[in-house]
């Protein structure tokens, strides 16, 4: 029956609220549609960072965390928080999966290779987790411990890796003293642009694989700090540092050998999958691997994908009665729609980590533009995305639609202020079209964001481009009937609010509150 009035949840990715107007692309942008909606309809600010979304206090939110909380209707304690707590409680050092991997390699006098994003960013990993893993390996008798450092510069300032590399070297010096017979060091450095690709650009991943497995890089240095200094001389920021092998005291590059154990220390899945598959897929065809060492163990810190044949140190905790599941149980239809960059977020993450569609669910994927960086096309494919979304609203097929506009976040990450302004203006135009379509067809809209980004484009301390997310609140605007906004709220309150507006009870698993109380 095609006469449904859609409730549309629009997620403007990276669209935070910041009172300070300097280097604020959202403030600078000409956004008449959102300005008018804010003046005319019930609205409020909601929290998207720290404990409000299950992260450590003061930790900025991100798209994965944001969409999990949005769809779950409850605060979901994130892997970051679980792992940090396990370290402080002393459980981490006894984690059976990690201990088994270390013990197997150590008993055969083989090396433990620890790798991942060496960063305090807390989005894909945290350096303190890596340092704890180094400690675990040494305490269990590992005599060869190597760190392969992926450098950030995206969730951290563009040139900030020196502090992290220094900390790692200090940790090794502490664990492996001069009187120690063991060997522990940073074995390689490379930018995340290569090692953490998620768009099937296998040539990038190949560079990271050859560096780690074969010790083959574009460059070779005696220390990680020398490698970083040389990269900066080449005008490469952290994210783009070329493959650099760090030699052992004997002057040779370090390789992964048969019997070695590999431990991937990223906790976020999306940018860890491709690199993991290089080691775990029996039918791997991303690129031709020159050498495939017979490693003893490959451990994922968390489960990156159900079909990756490797154990995870921290298994996923299942979520029941998330938004999509609850709608399906009540015979409601739903649509998930976004560009490639945020498609996983409105599907997999919004569904609480479930890949499969629910009954009555449909999905539309609009390809993101094929450009090197999105400042080259700040509008991305928002016009086509909006065409599809407006068509879906007009079709009358869907009770609920969730759409993500990636522009504020993806262009915000480039650090280009002018491009971010254009991105925000493009999104504003699209929001106007969607709101009109919803109103013309008897529907309603909730407009919000998953975290901030574009509202701060310059680091106030360093003066560098600010490419990371922020801890700022985000707007929530309800375009519909008369309603009273709550004084405060979080992302986990959005699903309960949508259900209230749709005239549905929320399941008991959803502990979030209603933020837009209808006035009878």
From Swiss-Prot:
Entry EC number(s): 5.4.2.12
Binding site for Mn(2+) 1: 409, 413, 469
Cofactor: Mn(2+)
Gene Ontology biological process terms, A to Z: glucose catabolic process; glycolytic process
GO cellular component: cytosol
Sequence positions that bind substrate: 124, 154-155, 192, 198, 268-271, 342
Free-text cofactor note: Binds 2 manganese ions per subunit.
CDD domains per the UniProt record, alphabetical: iPGM
Taxonomy, superkingdom: Bacteria
Catalytic activity field: (2R)-2-phosphoglycerate = (2R)-3-phosphoglycerate
Keywords carried by this UniProt record: Glycolysis, Isomerase, Manganese, Metal-binding
UniProt keyword annotation of Cytoplasm present: no
Enzyme class: isomerase
UniProt-recorded Gene Ontology molecular function terms: manganese ion binding; phosphoglycerate mutase activity
Membership in a protein family: Belongs to the BPG-independent phosphoglycerate mutase family.
PANTHER family: 2,3-BISPHOSPHOGLYCERATE-INDEPENDENT PHOSPHOGLYCERATE MUTASE
NCBIfam families in the record: pgm_bpd_ind
The protein, known as: 2,3-bisphosphoglycerate-independent phosphoglycerate mutase
Organism: Colwellia psychrerythraea (strain 34H / ATCC BAA-681) (Vibrio psychroerythus)
Gene field: gpmI
């Amino acid at each position: 029956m095609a006469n449904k009035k859609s409730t549309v949840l629009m997620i403007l990715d990276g669209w935070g609220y910041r009172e300070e107007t300097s280097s604020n692309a959202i403030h600078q942008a000409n956004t008449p549609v959102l300005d008018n909606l804010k003046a005319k309809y019930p609205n409020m600010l909601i929290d998207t960072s720290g404990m409000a979304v299950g992260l450590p206090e003061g930790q900025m939110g991100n798209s994965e965390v944001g969409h999990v909380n949005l769809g779950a209707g409850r605060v979901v304690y994130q892997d970051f928080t679980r792992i940090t707590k396990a370290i402080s409680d002393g459980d981490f050092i006894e984690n059976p999966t990690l201990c088994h991997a270390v013990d197997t390699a150590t008993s055969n006098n083989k090396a433990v290779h620890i790798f991942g994003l060496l960063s305090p960013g807390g989005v894909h990993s945290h350096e303190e987790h890596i340092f704890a893993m180094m400690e675990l390996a040494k305490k269990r008798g590992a005599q060869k411990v190597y760190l392969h450092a992926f450098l950030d510069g995206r969730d951290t300032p563009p040139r900030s890796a020196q502090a992290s590399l220094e900390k790692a070297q200090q940790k090794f010096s502490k664990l492996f003293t001069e009187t120690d017979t063991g060997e522990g060091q940073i074995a390689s450095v490379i930018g995340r642009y290569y090692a953490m690709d998620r768009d099937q650009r296998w040539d990038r991943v190949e560079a990271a694989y050859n560096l780690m497995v074969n010790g083959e890089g574009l460059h070779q240095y005696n220390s990680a700090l020398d490698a970083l200094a040389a990269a900066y001389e080449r005008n490469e920021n952290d994210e783009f540092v070329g493959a650099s092998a760090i030699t052992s005291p004997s002057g040779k590059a370090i390789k992964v050998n048969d019997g070695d154990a590999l431990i991937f220390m990223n906790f976020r899945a999306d940018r860890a999958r491709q690199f993991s598959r290089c080691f775990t897929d029996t039918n791997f065809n991303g690129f031709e691997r020159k050498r495939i060492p017979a490693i003893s163990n490959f451990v994922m810190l968390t489960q990156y994908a159900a079909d990756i044949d490797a154990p995870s140190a921290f298994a996923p905790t299942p979520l029941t009665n998330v938004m999509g599941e609850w709608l399906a149980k009540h015979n409601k239809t739903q649509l998930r729609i976004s560009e490639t960059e945020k498609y996983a977020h409105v599907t997999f993450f919004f569904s609480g980590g479930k890949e499969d569609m629910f009954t009555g669910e449909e999905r539309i994927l609009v390809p993101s533009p094929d450009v090197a960086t999105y400042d080259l096309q700040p509008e991305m494919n928002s016009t086509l995305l909006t065409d599809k979304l407006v068509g879906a609203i007009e079709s009358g097929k869907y009770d609920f639609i969730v759409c993500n506009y990636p522009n504020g976040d993806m262009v915000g990450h480039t650090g280009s202020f002018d491009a971010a302004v254009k991105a925000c203006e493009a999104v504003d135009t699209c929001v106007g079209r969607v709101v009109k379509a919803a109103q013309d067809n008897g529907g309603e809209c909730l407009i919000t964001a998953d975290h901030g980004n574009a509202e701060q484009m310059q680091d106030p301390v360093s003066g560098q481009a600010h490419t990371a997310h922020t801890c700022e609140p985000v707007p929530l605007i309800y375009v519909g009937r008369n309603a009273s906004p709550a004084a405060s709220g979080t992302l986990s309150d959005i699903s309960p609010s949508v259900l209230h507006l749709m005239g549905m009870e929320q399941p008991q698993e959803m502990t979030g509150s209603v933020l837009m109380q209808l006035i009878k």
